[in-house]
Amino acid sequence: MKVRVRIPAVKEVSESMKTLSTTSELAAFCAEAQKHPYVTIDTEFLRERTYYSKLCLLQLAMPGKDDDTAVLVDPLSEGLSLAPLYDLFRDTSVVKVFHAARQDLEIFFVDAGVFPDPLFDTQVAAMVCGFGEQVGYETLVRKIAKKTLDKSSRFTDWSRRPLTDEQKIYALADVTHLRVIYEHLAGILETSGRTRWVQEELQILTNPATYITEPDEAWMRVKTRNTSPKFLAIVRELAKFREQYAQSRNIPKTRVYKDDAIVELSSTKPRDLNDLNRSRLLMREARKGDIAQGILTAVQLGLDCPQALLPQPDLGREKLQVNPALSDLLRVLLKSKTSDSGVASKLIASSADLDAIAAGLRDVPAMKGWRREVFGEDALRLCEGQIGLAAEGTNIRIIKL
């Protein structure tokens, strides 16, 4: 989390604040945590100079009112193993609580191939409980824990040692307030019967495919207006080489070359170093050595791609015949449903999903699971002319036709 607590200069650091630096200390904490219904977790990491995130600090807290049950874990300590933590992740009697868990979970999955079970993400839960879309930790701390966090605090290089007492207090705040937030949201979900909704949403966070980028599929993330299969074949090979190169050397893929360079190279089709040096968008480091050779090889592979193996763009939704009037009605219905349920509208259906439904598609997220209950069923009835919408003051009323 990037938001930190403002600490008055006169405040003394709690003597109970612990930093664990050995495997045995972590094991002892995790053994104690297994006696409790939940544990809150957060991480501090760096990713500016690497492909994979570098874990720099781990924060853990058991239920409690103060910092006595919260600890910091220093993963940079020599010889420290996170195996006890991963054993705790596998203990299904203890809920593992995060806020905006995706990047945290990616770190653990890459390191050990394990996911916390069961998982609770307060950001997802907050969207279901009426706190808006992608609500930030600072907002939940203010609204639920009734505390104030400092949004203007600067980012910290968490890889540097030793950590200051102020940094430690900052980090602990990410898990101590999270306890209050979790208990509050879990109570709302239980009362409203929406716990299952959150569980459905969290399935994508515990799906390995969420965190694995296959080099062969990297081209699908490159935005280009040219949909020619021959052009896309070169895009595919260039994106594949970049992903493989970045992964093998653990460097950001943008330091190899950027997406706009892929688009340019796929258009200019360089055959040799002289051609490569004419590129306007290619970084200097990419014009020589292994990267340059990889680019030339990738371009040639794309040019030589057999007709049967050429990539085909997914133009399914682009060719849809969208009924604009029906699409507008679906937006009105969605706004009405989100107003009634308190669920963030984007969590139920995106604009693209609404257009797809208006064009006759039914295999969209809004037509599955809890979304179908909240919105999908009435959306279908609206499309089929079974219901209409009527204004009633500031509200929208559904009427049967």
Where are these predicted regions, by residue range?
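Short, glycine/acidic-enriched capping/hinge loops at junctions between secondary-structure elements
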Residues: T50-K54, L72-D74
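Residues that scaffold, gate, or flank divalent-cation-dependent active/transport sites
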Residues: R47, C56-Q59
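Conserved short loop/turn motifs at secondary-structure junctions
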Residues: L46, V124-V128, D260-E264
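Active-site-proximal helix-loop-helix substrate-binding element of RNase H-like nuclease domains
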Residues: T19, Q59-R179, A186, L205-T206
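N-terminal accessory regions of nucleic-acid-interacting proteins
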Residues: V5-V39, T43
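An N-terminal domain-cap segment
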Residues: K35-H36, I41-Y52, G79-A83, D91
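Accessory DNA-binding and partner-docking regions appended to nucleic-acid-acting proteins
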Residues: D165, L185-L401
